[in-house]
Amino acid sequence: MKKVTAMLFSMAVGLNAVSMAAKAKASEEQETDVLLIGGGIMSATLGTYLRELEPEWSMTMVERLEGVAQESSNGWNNAGTGHSALMELNYTPQNADGSISIEKAVAINEAFQISRQFWAHQVERGVLRTPRSFINTVPHMSFVWGEDNVNFLRARYAALQQSSLFRGMRYSEDHAQIKEWAPLVMEGRDPQQKVAATRTEIGTDVNYGEITRQLIASLQKKSNFSLQLSSEVRALKRNDDNTWTVTVADLKNGTAQNIRAKFVFIGAGGAALKLLQESGIPEAKDYAGFPVGGQFLVSENPDVVNHHLAKVYGKASVGAPPMSVPHIDTRVLDGKRVVLFGPFATFSTKFLKNGSLWDLMSSTTTSNVMPMMHVGLDNFDLVKYLVSQVMLSEEDRFEALKEYYPQAKKEDWRLWQAGQRVQIIKRDAEKGGVLRLGTEVVSDQQGTIAALLGASPGASTAAPIMLNLLEKVFGDRVSSPQWQATLKATVPSYGRKLNGDVAATERELQYTSEVLGLKYDKPQAADSTPKPQLKPQPVQKEVADIAL
């Protein structure tokens, strides 16, 4: 009995010692100018901007996993597309009169040009090294079949020729020509099937995880930057002087630490919503989140991989979210080429791939539960789509693959679970709540804390998104001559549009292609195509979009 008592006493003393140590460490405040929560591409990009703009500012980055770029930024957890609307048909919706709207496509392409310029500038500075390790030329193609879809692609191609950003795009309805562009897609296909494709040679495959690792490695070279891994944010508290005290737990030894920061950026991917709520700022009350995961079929068989060099995007089926469009992609991951097909939607209540099953429940509050319910009731087609995706069998997924690769063999493919994407649900005065595709910077009125919510187009537009954050939070500094000069050196087209300016578009594409080692040939005249038949579209209930 005495031994048991002694053992229990020693355990109690030990636990008390750990608790006291945690409290002692928490009382030792670390001070920093900027706290970056999350070790992904958004925090890395913002940190890189600030390092150039204010080199004397101290920065601390905290990441809950054992390394950076292990969640959504990881190359295996996303599609790796340099989203520039060259092939993504959801960015060019069809109007009621049958015409094609290109405004969204132009905006997406403009944004990606900023990312290209930002990365090229970092290569010239020596921050990013060996461009082929993170970006490679992979042609972007749209591919459709069936009379209506072919007519849509004709109209899309014609509409995009109005923009200087889409010059150089090719169009064909010829089986032989399309087979030359994408052999996998055409071999074994019915020669009588009506098909059409567009192809743009300057498309890219991007490893966002590698970009993240290199950016953070460069930040670490400065003594006023600190990276803390296996460190999870447990609390955020605003101080009277508008600084923030953030409690961070060391997941390895159980201790805690307080970090006092003048500015906090929450770039924690799916976890950003919960941390934003934890901050208590009133702006957070308008938001909720709904997690959707994605799976891909992967082939590493050389017979498949060496027979396909393109990203080929199709058109979403009727009743499916426009962004759910399937695609068969060349990827360059871990230094080698692979082919991915998907995505297939999955459901988990986790907000991160390495998150908790309680994430969805714990983010639901009295202020956002009604917007969530309204979104669910107003988007029954989306709910049906997600249920149908979750119920897919191995055979179902393989049949979907064969629509894009008729001669596919099951033994060449394996299923891979990619990352989680938390869709934004925002309070809406008219509808109660709406599902928002895209990303959104949410900040307090004082500009002391900001979070990035949303999932698409995500990493490919990290550079323009963080520019938007700088303008929103550091408006006075952004307008200063010093910051203006630095930003224009970092992003040469900053403050102006490339669309409509052929010379400027070609100049920036030539510059970034040379620095990043990408293919770029001066665009030739547009292909002649059959005139599209613009037919009025039947009135259909709009399907809410989601990012997979």
Swiss-Prot record:
Residue ranges, compositional bias (Low complexity): 530-541
Domain of life from the UniProt record: Bacteria
Pathway linked to the protein: Carbohydrate metabolism; tricarboxylic acid cycle; oxaloacetate from (S)-malate (quinone route): step 1/1
Record-level Gene Ontology MF annotations: 2-hydroxyglutarate dehydrogenase activity; L-malate dehydrogenase (quinone) activity
Cofactors required: FAD
Stored Pfam families: Mqo (PF06039)
InterPro entries: FAD/NAD-bd_sf, MQO
Protein's GO biological process: tricarboxylic acid cycle
Record region (Disordered): 521-548
EC numbers on record: 1.1.5.4
Keywords tagged on the record: FAD, Flavoprotein, Oxidoreductase, Tricarboxylic acid cycle
Reaction catalyzed: (S)-malate + a quinone = a quinol + oxaloacetate
Record-stated family: Belongs to the MQO family.
Protein's UniProt name: Probable malate:quinone oxidoreductase
Species assigned in the record: Escherichia coli (strain SMS-3-5 / SECEC)
